[in-house]
Amino acid sequence: MPTINSPADLERFRQEILAKRSSEKARISVCAGAGCLATGARKVIDAFSAEIEKEGLEKEVCVKGTGCPGFCERGPIVVIDPEQTCYLQVTPQDVPEIVSETIQQKKVVERLLYSDAANNVKATREADIPFYKHQERNIIGNNIKIDPKCIDDYLALGGYSALTKALFQMTAEQVVEEVKKSGLRGRGG
């Protein structure tokens, strides 16, 4: 990673990351948070990687383990972009069907969608699931887009912009005042 000496350096580096990533490349994001890992997410990630390789789709599709999107009771959770198709309780056995149907044929695997118990209405996108629908996801809203082991994912989404502002555009007094106004008190809140 290059040295960042100004906000312009950070923005230039972010643009380089974005340029390397194909916006047309499908992305399979598998929750790799503790809850999903406990229910088999690592095996799901491995199954997707193997299936993508088997089908010769490495240039069209990337597979990422990501942060927790929050709906742990329904994990492992898989989100496929750019369509934002959200599948719940995915197993390695589901992977060939997902790759064939959703990745190759652009069809939805209905049985893996969220289904509202009250009215049996299915939600295709994470944002349409009642658990998420009314949430304002300020802190973990991008978790399903970020591999916690890949700093480029964070930078591509604008990560470190607040730090850059504090370092290069604010005085020490302004930084202290901003922290006081925020109400932050440490790890415990």
Language-model features: locations:
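Feature of Fe-S/electron-transfer and energy-metabolism proteins
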Residues: 1-189
